Structure formats: structure tokens, C-alpha cells
């Protein structure tokens, strides 16, 4: 049987071509689209098909297909949903993962689409129930049980005391108040997630207008809200403890079974060890793991055989009374990680190249041979862009070389000169969006010794602890450095050999030649980078096979200096060579060599001519990020993937790993135990070792340790980020309870979203005014080697020291004190004119002298005076408390016994009177507003207002 998109049900035509969610309900055995406004609303008597399309970074689409079966749906409707899902998968390209979802036993992946929960309603299409925007029925008191740390399974239970227990979270929804009952054995994370359901119920069924109360199991009648809660159940009575039979009910050992679907029947396959070789490409198999069942469909199977295998899986579950089990269907070559993990050893999956014109590799060819329409299966492949560092490049850098148990601070002129046999520690402080940020890292040369590496880790950890874990920490290996490292150093040279005593001892013991770089000796450098703020000179073996047509090189021996330009290089590459010559051989002239026109002397220095590469050294591209919660128990690391993650998934009590293949981030919550916090780097290394996503991760992959409240932008870019959430104190449950009760979401001016990629620095600035720590002149000027440092000193006096140049554009900030008149243009142009005059004086063809002074124009001086007077006037304006809600300080604190009602808990200070505000903060409101947001939050925290 063959189909194409035009042969499938009209409701499926054109679907799966853009990122997002599409839902259909089965009505009279036909799929009917569900409007977007009703996504997440399910009826117990119906069956649904859900398609999640995800746009991947490699330019392709990933499709996940789910068919959801309500507990009261008919068997015919359930079968229709299963068959239609197989047909839709074939029409989409035959590589989607298909999930059978049963009410109450949904996969976490499905629940992640409909956050915070799915709350199925009684009835269905056969009963006349339709998807409507608002349920207009009278409110009925309902009791729900909530389970889950990362996503929440919600189930309605009878409104009786016997439904309650000590292990779970319960939500009692009454007409005027919502109660959350926290079982004494439930964990903080479950309680926090259940509060998201409380917020959903409040917004959906109460229009956001009702009280919320939290009841702790065991507090009895001492608490007013607890007394009110138990009164609804007819009074308090102790809850029974879970029996031992209930505790052990789910501990039955399941035996994994493999069955082959052959000519309409299932045949058991016996095995001692589950191996990949048991699966044949022209057959379908059922892998029964108890709680879930997998259907594996070989690429050589027909659509009819795949349908038959799907029906056989459904029938097997019915016959064995296992209707609640999940069924996951995978196609050969597109298996899930969980399916692969069931086997003793799974071979690397070949990288199927996908084409928007011809379909998806071999799978598309197979489908075309069966008459399937595979056009338009891919979006246009994106152009490769230089990765953005998302870090301010103008901060303060310090570098130490590790030598045994100690470290030596390098001078500013030597801190960018690293040796491959040594280990280094660097500390970089820079201005972040809300406060000063810090990155502490280690860099291990390829030939560094274990003794120095161990010492570097220990010394860096002490620095990290001394910073009270408020910095980010990095572990980097030579050859695997992230973009942030290069833009921090800007102009970097990596030399052969090493200077540490550990390295010297190592080569002495092993009888190895010491190839440590000598300025007057023979050396060859490969030049690479993307610009003046990101350029490196890497010393390589001084032989012709080290050359590459895609790069430029510097070769020197004594007073002889050559530059070699490959045929595939650009003008930028040539510019980088000139810049690196200023560092490596600043006082010697160089002789240029073009590829194919080299002199004999050049080849003689390299030991003769031989073949070399012309392909640029490949770099791994960042993959789509995956977030995992981590538990380290007795040196055993257990992880769980969080699907479609958001910032709210980062719980203060837990450690998470964000894996984007090129980098690994370990996020540590504020409430994590101190001992576990110190093992964050170990967790990252164990994650790389286990390679949970089977990505063939290198052990040298960069690892960043990120602490809650001090997240750098190169981490937050993976989220829709709200800094105020990470700056709140208390457990994840306490924070969410404050938000739910206060009715406000904490935020700063605006949440920080993923920063759009721009090349270079702020695009809105004139390039002639840009500068970096490593640049003593404008990149647009003609370069003259050996220029006197006097020019730099004088020119810098005219540049604005407060101007920041970011590797990515800074967030827009409103002016606190806008001027009504005047312009900044005269001030800027006058300073730039002076700098240009100095430039021409030093670089022009005629001899000039430096002016003794440069006067500021009257227009600029007037503008400065206007700005100063405007600020002064704003700060001295009297403050008016009229038309404002005012509460005394004692009722506004986070620890108040009588908290003020209906306030924005993220802006408690605005409810203080002007007099009390000045008394507590020691300044006026206007002065307070003029402070950076991070400083405001610190002052508020000190006063228990945050």
C-alpha cells in the first residue's frame, strides 16, 4: 500500500511544515482539527492525535506523533487513532516517533506540551461536548491528586478524606478558595510544581480571582487555613499510613520480551543478551518492557506491515489487560535514546544527510519508491554563522601559570602567551546586565602533566569558593576552547613546550626532546580567528605538511621572517597575520610568500616541500540543547531529560545539566547541599563519560559551572529568562507560593530573551570609534607596525572610558533623566575630530606635532551642564504619596506576621511612604530608581523587601 500527502485525510494535508503543535480529535472515525485556543483540553470519551513539529538547528524538522486515548473512548476510535497516526507518519517522511498515550499514564514528553497539566473533562463528541473557550457551568468542588517533580500528572479523585495520603499533593478547588494539601512525605519540587496547577485552576476556573491557601500535613488545627481545610472534610482525622503491600506493589521484576511480527502473527525471539543484530530491516518487532512497549519498524517494511504491527501491539495490551501501558513506535535509523539503551550495545547511527529537494536521505528514497510524496520535508538549511560569545569583551583579565602546588600571576604582556605543556587559571570580571560578573576557569595544554592539572583544579576551586560561588567556573582543554575563551583573550598565542617544573621533569624522565618555543629559533604558526577581538597564533610542527591552503602562517628562524598566504584565504586572514606579527616579531621585517610562488629558502626552512591539506579545520556545531536533572548517589549519576524546558524547570534544590554538544553547563540551585555543590564538576565529567545522548561526546568538551543567581548571558540565552526569578530567596516552593498568593510574576524591566545574533560589536556604533582591550587603534585605520605607544596614550584620553563594547548588543535601557533640549552630537563629533586630527598627525605623510591641548566645544560643554542640572532637578523634586496605596514597613517585609494584602511582592518598596522610604533606604525614590537593578535588589534584600 502506498500513499502520498494528497492521498491522506484532508485534515492532514500540509501539516508538519512549521515549528509548533497541531491537534486533531477523532469524530466519526475522521480527524477533525482542534482550534489552537482549545489545545490541552481533552474529553475522557474521545481519542486525539497530537503532532509536535520542532525546527532543528541543522535545518530539518523533527516530528513527534502522539495519539491520546481517554479512559471512556471506544475501542474503534482508539484503533482509528492508531492507524491514522501510522499513515500520517508515512506521509511526513516515515521517521517520526509515535507514542500511544493513555489518560492518567501520559508520557512526560506529551505533558510538556501542555504545561502545567492536562485535566480531562467528562464526556466526549458522542455526548455532544465540544471544545469551547470557557466552561460556563456552575462551580463544583473538586479534589485532585498531583504527582511529578518535573511535569505534573493530575487526576480527579473522590472528594472524601480517604482520598488523602501522606505521599502526594492534593488540590481542593472550592468556589471561593483553592487549597493545596502537601503530604508530609512529598518533596519540595513536587509541591512547587503543584502550585503551577493551582495557578492554572485559579486563572482558568476563577478568572484569577480567588484566595489560595497552603496546608501542611501534620499541622492539625493550629493553623487557621488548616482548620478551614479539614472542616470541609467534616473535621480532622489522622490519615492511614501506606501499607507494606502498597509500598511493594510496583516492585515486581519485569522480563523484557522480543517478538517478531511475521505474516500477521507474533513470534517470540529467544536471546541471552539483547543485541542490535537481532533486528532485521525487512521486519517489525515488539520489544515488551512491561510499563512500556516499543514497536520497531525496519526501513524495508511496507506501510501495510507497519499498520499490522501497530494493531498487534494494541491487541496484545488488551488481551493482557494492560490498557494503561504506553506504546512507542520507532523507525529504523530514528530510534529514541531510551530504545537504544535497552540493548547491550547499539552501533553508531549513520548521519543521514537530508535534502529539501530530494527528501530525507535513504528514508526518503524508500518512501519515493513506494509512491510517497516526500517534497518539502525540510526547511531551507541555515547559513553557518560565526557563533556569538554573549559576553562583554572589555572586562578585566588576570592569568596565572600553575607550577606544582602554586600559581604565578602573569604580566599583562604575557597573559595571552600560553604553552601547550602548561596549565593556567584565568579570572575574568566584566559588566553583566544586572551586576558585575566573573568567570573563573582552567586551561589545560595538550601536553600538560597530570600533577599540574590536579593542582589547577584545586586552586581554581578555592578561588571559586572564595567568590562565594557567585562566579561561573569553566574547565577547558586546548583545542576545544569555546568562543568565550577566545574573545576574553582576544589576541592569543599558543606555543610549543612548557615552562612548569612538572613539564620539565616529565620530559627529562622520559628522555623526550624539549621543544619549548625559543624566540630566535625555528617556529611555524597557524593564524586563525574571526577578527581583531578573536584571533589566535597556534605553533605547529615546522614542516610543510603543517600548511593548509585555508590559512595564513608565520615562519621565523633567527632574523628571517616569512608570512605564507594560502590560496583559499581572505583579506581578513591577511589582516590577522599582520596583527600577530606585531606580537610575535614586532621589530623584524617579513617576506610575503603566496601559495604556489614560494622561494627555495622558505621550503628549506620547512625541510622540503610535501603534500598538505586545503580543507579548513572543522569545528563542531552547537546542537539543539537538552536539559537533564541529575542525581549523584554513591558515585552513580542518574539523569532525567526535561522536555521543552523553561526557566521554571530549574529547581533551587537540584542540579541540572544543559547539553548542547559543543559545551556542557552544570546549573546548581541555591538550596543544593554544600557537599553536593562541591561535586558539580564531577557531575559534568561523569555526564560526558556516560554520553547519555550517544553523541560521541569528547571528555575534553568545555564544562561550565553556573550557580543560581549568577547565570551569565551565554547560559541564559537558552531560555526566556527573567533575572528576578533567579534572585529570589527560599526554596522553589516558597518562591512559587509567594507568586501565587501575591498574584504577580517577578520581573525586571523585561525578561531577557535569546539575544539575536549580530556579528561583531554593537551594530549601532561607528566602527571608527570601536576599540578593545587588545587594540590600540581603530580597525579602520591604516596599520603601521612599530607605532609609538605615545599615540595610544594620547588618543585614549579622548575616548569615553564609560563606553562599553559588547560582543552582542546590550539590552535597551530607558533613560532615567531625559533632557528636553540639547544634543549629544556636538560632544561626540568634537572628540572624534580631535582624535582624527591626532591620527593624521601620526599617520599622515607630513611631519606634525601633537597639540598641547584640545578644547571641548562650547556646544558640548553646554550639553554637559544641561545634563547635570537636569539630574539635580529630578533628584530634588518633592515626592507625592497621593493616589498611592501605602503600608507600614513592618507589613511589607517578607517575614511579616501580618503581611499586606494584594501587593506586588516583587515591588514591596513602592508601598512605603516617601518619609519611610527615605528613612529605610537612606535616599529618595528618584535616587533609588537611578541605581542599577542588581544594586536595588541587594538593598531590598538587606531590608527583607525582596
UniProtKB/Swiss-Prot annotation:
GO biological processes: actin filament capping; actin filament organization; actin filament severing
One Gene Ontology MF term: actin filament binding
CDD domains, A to Z: gelsolin_S1_like, gelsolin_S2_like, gelsolin_S4_like, gelsolin_S5_like
Cellular component terms (Gene Ontology): actin filament bundle; cytoplasm
Subcellular location per the Swiss-Prot or TrEMBL entry: Cytoplasm, Cytoskeleton
Compositional bias (Acidic residues): 874-883
Biased composition (Polar residues): 765-777
Main location: cytoplasm
Record keywords: Actin capping, Actin-binding, Calcium, Cytoplasm, Cytoskeleton, Repeat
Gene3D superfamilies noted in UniProt: Severin, Villin headpiece domain
Spans of repeat Gelsolin-like: 28-109, 152-219, 274-339, 641-715
Cited SUPFAM superfamilies: Actin depolymerizing proteins, C-terminal, gelsolin-like domain of Sec23/24, VHP, Villin headpiece domain
Region annotation Disordered: where it falls in the sequence: 744-783, 846-902
Residues annotated as domain HP: 881-946
Family: Belongs to the villin/gelsolin family.
Described function: Ca(2+)-regulated actin-binding protein. Binds actin microfilaments (MFs). Involved in actin filament bundling, severing and capping. Caps the barbed end of actin filaments and is able to sever them in a calcium-dependent manner.
Protein name: Villin-4
